[in-house]
Every structure is written in structure tokens, then in C-alpha cells.
């Protein structure tokens, strides 16, 4: 099959798990003999065509009033204008139409669409492509993509959500199959009124299984945090946990965002070792317990699965798709249930049957079944 995958970012650009998941899927499809073109955006003003691991990649100019992932603070009016343009980005829609005419895909599979817009669905359907959409964030429901604001979850029934999502619901009628990366995110979109007459599935992200690593002595547990060092990810709670356990070593890998100056100071005051960016495999060798006090409704939780596959214990919160993961995988404990870090059990071995639904080949085959219809 000839497949176009669409995602806001693609290799080598990365801010979260979505980019990893889309890259794994793209390269797995190539290995199975399919033709794959990935369409994404970048911060430059010219289109760039390249190839990586057999995947053709097209980076389109961002085509808005500013680069949406810039760390520069913007005034409220600029933000509103950016999001209004992003409801239907005419420039990107035209570029995408040209790509469809050139590539002639059988399948258009969209993922994160912030900065690209849902206009691509309409263009794909115009040329009789089968359209699949996978939600990896909450962009369709609200432009902040997290459904988390001022320290609490946003209601999908709020006026703001209804207004921002209306045009996307209309464009969503061009989607043939809808996929959520957890039952939680799928059900949340259904609750918000999306994809009423569309086929719907849950397909968890593929996660490559790592070798189980030995732990250090039980009285010398090293606790780690990996991901974006932000409030919604619970990094402040990680720092406070460090303050309460000064005899333990606390290590954090990841980058701060533009609003995290106070968090960085909190980390330094809490004696948290900051590594900056660190590859997941390298980080897993430095720690014994992964602490992820996530506050927003994380749709999946790739780091949780990566940590479990690396033989770690995960301490986290009952949020979003992570609650589902705790019913599938062992070694996941909730912070509200833990009184003493030293009482946390050693990890138990993972059964192959528990890994299956995250297996790269298994996940790719699930998508291929959907592609074929």
C-alpha cells in the first residue's frame, strides 16, 4: 500500500511520545514492504524533502503567524489569532493537496495535527483516500492539546471546548476510522461529540522491549523522572518528594519549558540532579524507580511502559490511560498508596503475553487491518 502519515513533528524533531510512536509505525510499515511518506511541519520557511530509514519525509513550512513550538512568550491576541488560523490552515491544505496529487496515496493516516489543521482530512477525502485518524493528544477537543488548565482538568462540555472544537467535528466527518491510543482518550473524544458515525478502535502504542536490568541494593534506591519538566507532568511533586527523602538520590532527565523558571530553582533547592536531555535507555541504567506524578489526563504514558520493560518500578497517579496500563502491566504503583519509598516491592518479571499488545509487529498489523478495511 501507498501510505501518507501526518504528524506535527517527525524525526529528528521530538517533544513527546507521539513522534516516537509515529516513527516506529512508519519504519515498521516500510519493513513490511509498504511505501510510506510522512508529512510534518518545521520552523523554516521552505519545504524540505528528505528520507530516513526508507521513509520519505516532507517538512512543510509552518504557515502561521509564528512557529507554534517557539519558547518565546506570546500575547493573548497573537495566540488567539494563531489558533483561529489553525482551525483551517489554507496554506497547508493547498500544499497537502499538491502532495496527494503527487504521491497518490491509498491511505492518509493523521496523528497530531496542531499546526497542520484538520483541513488535511477534507483534502484526502476529495481524492478518495481512506482516512484514518489516531488521537495522541486532545488537540481536536481544545487547542491547548492537554485539556488541563490552571491546575485542573477541563470539561469537554464547557463553552470554550464546544466553540473551539465545532469546526473540527464537522471536518471529522471526512474520517473513515478513528483510533485512540487508550480507551480513555477514545472515550473522551466520543464524550466530546467526535466521530459519531465513524468506526472506532483502541490501539496502544508500540514500545520496544528492553533487557531487564539489575537493581542496586534495596537501601540505595535511585529515583528518576524523565520527560518534560513541567507542572502538568508533576515535576514539582517530584521535587517535593526529594525534599522529604533527602537520603535518596533523585535524578531528572528532560527539558524545562518557557514557564518553568521557578521549577528549575525548586529542583536545585531540592538537590535534584538535572541531566538535561538523556536517551531513555541510558537513563534507565541510572535509576531504580521511575516517579511520574502526572497531573493531566495523560492519554497513554509511553515512559511508563518503557520503564516497566526496562525492569523498573513506576510510581505515578491514577490519570488517563495510565490507569489502564496499571491493569495490563505489573510494577505500577500509585503515589497515594505509598507511605514509604523503602516499602516499595522489587519488580516482578513481565510475562510475554503482557508485552504483546505493545509489540511493534502486533501494533503495525492492527493498523494494516484498519487500512485494508
UniProtKB/Swiss-Prot annotation:
Any GO molecular function: glycosyltransferase activity
SUPFAM superfamilies attached to this UniProt entry: UDP-Glycosyltransferase/glycogen phosphorylase
Superkingdom of origin organism: Bacteria
Protein name: Uncharacterized 42.6 kDa protein in cps region
